[in-house]
Amino acid sequence: MSNVRISEIANELGYPSKEIVEKAQELGLKVKTHSNAVSLEEAEAIYEYVQSGVIPEKFKKEKPKAKPKKEAKEPSEKEVGKKQTKAKEEKPAKASTTQKKDTKSHKIGETKAKKDQESVKKQKVEVQPKQEQTKQELQPKEAEFKSEVKDEISEPQKPKESLADVSQRRRGLMIVKKKKEFESAPVRRDENRVKSTDAVEINSLKNMFASSDENLARKKKKDKKPVVATKKDSAQKMDLLGSSDFGDIVIEDEDVVVLPDFSFKTPTPQPMQKTKQPNVLKPTINNTINPFGEGGIQRRARKKHKKPENKQNSEAVTSINIPKEIRVYEFAEKLNKQPSEIIGKLFMLGMMTTKNDFLDEDAIEILADEFNVEVNIIDDQKEFDYVAAYEEEVRDDENLLPRAPVITIMGHVDHGKTSLLDYIRKSRVAAGEAGGITQHVGAYMVNKNGKNITFIDTPGHEAFTAMRARGAGVTDIVIIVVAADDGVKPQTKEAVNHAKAAGVPIIIAINKMDKEAANPDLVKTGLAELDIMPTEWGGKYEFVPISAKTGMGIDDLLEIVLLQAEILELKANPKASAKASVIESSLQKGRGPVATIIVENGTLRVGDTVVAGVAYGKIRSLLDDQGRPLQEIKPGECGVIVGLSEIAEAGETLIGVKTDKEAREYAQKKAEYLRQKELSKSTKVSLDELSAKIAEGELKTLPVIVKADVGGSLEALKASLEKLANNEIKVDIIHSGVGGITQSDVALASASKDCVILGFNIRPTGEIKEKAKESGVEIKTYNVIYNLIDDVKALLGGLMSPIIREEQLGQAQVRQVINVPKIGAIAGCLVTEGTINRGAKIRLIRDGVVVYEGMVSSLKRFKDDVKEVAKGYECGVGIEGCNDIRENDYIESFKEIEEQAKL
């Protein structure tokens, strides 16, 4: 016979294991913890004892003091308790099956009708003493109850249950899936016991309470509420196969069903199952039991777990370390404050924030003063700062060898920078450039006297400021080219400022000396105003007159460059891992993302793993400036790398790392940081900016998609287009990218109203053109940045409100006012200047002040209608909607001309 654990009984009944252990100990069982096991018979006794509160007969003999204790608390029910106890101890002979069925069918109707009355009386029997009237009514019933029990109890081994047990039968019943191991003979014996006991219980109860006073029960129900203890059992687990209603039916279905029970039935204790059932035996105090089973089983409210109090709140925070980029809720956690406190402080200062917004340095400083906290800002980018990690790793000064100098050529547009480089390289790059101007950054290698020199050619157009700044940032020496016939121009001044900011030596090349209009002194004077003094004037800057066309002075220029490089003592460690700067990047068909780089330290080889910002990868191939393959690039040299995961941003630092995993982690952390930073910008708004954002919503926008051949040109285009804005219109760049125009670009443009695709140095394919035509999308491509900017300006001008310009037509003096019936006042005028035209707008001027502005309704000379009246002639003028005309007033005639606005 298998045993059942106390914990399983507790789970089945929905009671704590501790209470079940105590009940088992009250029955005299040797149980100490919930893990102890008892037999099925003992488990059945515990189950019955917990439900009814009455100790079974078998265990009552071992512990006889349990019942007298209950009787002592209920002195008013002494006689009834004795009768019931006596009835339970008797062992009458078994009644016949026919007698049980007849008794049950005869009594069941009346039993159901009195269920509520019996439930109330059961509660009163347990809770409060009965009055005299109750005793008198119950005494004859007790005698009858006793005789009925002696005659009809059919199961000698089954102890008689109390009135409380019987009232429990009205609860909802639960049919539980049976297990095969328990479908044995003991269950069948229980079925027979249920059948015999049902008839006894129903018959005896009917005789006991047939003539009870309903008014007394109703009165007592009003006097005192039912005790909560009687509500513990909201449902019973019963074996319907043992019910007399289903005695002849065999049910083999194992499904679990829940049904309401409207009859009195004695429960057959089921073997304990491990499956945890819903806790329906222990409802909360406020829950009520539905006697008709409507609405199913009531569920207890989930207990709310109390959050552990944060002990740190009581501790005063005096100093915190925070990253440079920190959100409001993160700052609140550092201070042991609620985010609402931080948001409230910022709101009082006029800043509207949410808990996910980043705090700037000013806000952090203000909050630190408000909360009296010392704030130390740390660099949170260290975890993905691969450049700093490289610098720490490569610190030794050993293995340093001279490297090639990096020279950047800068200057104003059309001053001959690329032509100078073409002569040095013996090439013709300038001839192949669109519009004759440089629009990309180029890096080239030149060998002079057995020494390599790396040249960087930068654009001179104003749109390429960022390109020039990048060129100056990675260079060792800057050559500023100035045309001798043009002098110092705006981009010349900008180039000087970039070079000074980079702290690099400057060499001035005075170009176009072969022209007759060349004036080198003009160049020297202009640069002297920028503190660039030539050596012959007592300064420290070399001025070299050259001609990129004839080659005059170019050898002298290269000699000065090499001499300056020797003075700088440029050295690097070729044995270290590579460190390089990305000068330009693009997307090439068949190669994918490519980048033009200049190696600053170490040696870059094919197969190296590198990371550059959010791009990483293993180098598949290296190319020189003429497209020839290389195996390695040494310090100070330039080249093109192939193999990055995506287009590297121009200006990024490229570092060689040991493993692909390390490179991927750096790139992903950097990408996540940039994404979070971008998201935070979109949520920030202050009170001062709120009105500006509302007004911005009223701006007219020109949506564009910008595609360019290289990243540097794309950056320059975006910067130039964003500048084309005023208080009425602006350019909205909805997408930009490097590479050709794709079908997704056309689809995006078609989804945006009036969107234009702008391509720079790229051409769409025939398929793309056809799809754009079908979608009604306009594609415009350019090779020169001037033309692109001018066209966008024209488009913006068409969207702007037209300019209204007035053109004066003439003036007339009112000599006499004539009142015409049904028409109004007519001004008799003499035209003193120009002409007065019918249909034109006029102003009525009195004493130099405009008193009315409207249209000419009629214009007559004598009796004839005329279109216009010239100077020196008299006429009659009717003004539409105006009768307040006086003598000596002036009438001024004009027309409005609309002109397209220009940006």
Swiss-Prot record:
Keywords: Cytoplasm, GTP-binding, Initiation factor, Nucleotide-binding, Protein biosynthesis
Region (G5) residue spans: 547-549
Chief place where the protein resides: cytoplasm
Keyword field contains Cytoplasm: yes
Region (G1) residue spans: 411-418
GO cellular component, one term: cytosol
Region (G2): 436-440
Gene name as annotated: infB
Compartment(s) where it occurs, according to its Swiss-Prot or TrEMBL record: Cytoplasm
A GO molecular-function descriptor: GTP binding
Functional description taken from the UniProt entry: One of the essential components for the initiation of protein synthesis. Protects formylmethionyl-tRNA from spontaneous hydrolysis and promotes its binding to the 30S ribosomal subunits. Also involved in the hydrolysis of GTP during the formation of the 70S ribosomal complex.
Region (G4): 511-514
InterPro entries in the cross-refs: EF-G-like_DII, IF2_II, IF2_N, P-loop_NTPase, Small_GTP-bd, T_Tr_GTP-bd_dom, TF_IF2_bacterial-like, TIF_IF2
CDD domains assigned: IF2_eIF5B, IF2_mtIF2_II, mtIF2_IVc
Family indicated by similarity: Belongs to the TRAFAC class translation factor GTPase superfamily. Classic translation factor GTPase family. IF-2 subfamily.
Compositional bias segments (type: Low complexity): 267-278
Protein name as catalogued: Translation initiation factor IF-2
Signal peptide range: none
Location of the region described as G3 in the Swiss-Prot/TrEMBL record: 457-460
Gene3D superfamilies xrefs: 1.10.10.2480, P-loop containing nucleotide triphosphate hydrolases, Translation factors, Translation initiation factor IF- 2, domain 3
Biased segments, Basic residues type: 299-308
Binding site for GTP: 411-418, 457-461, 511-514
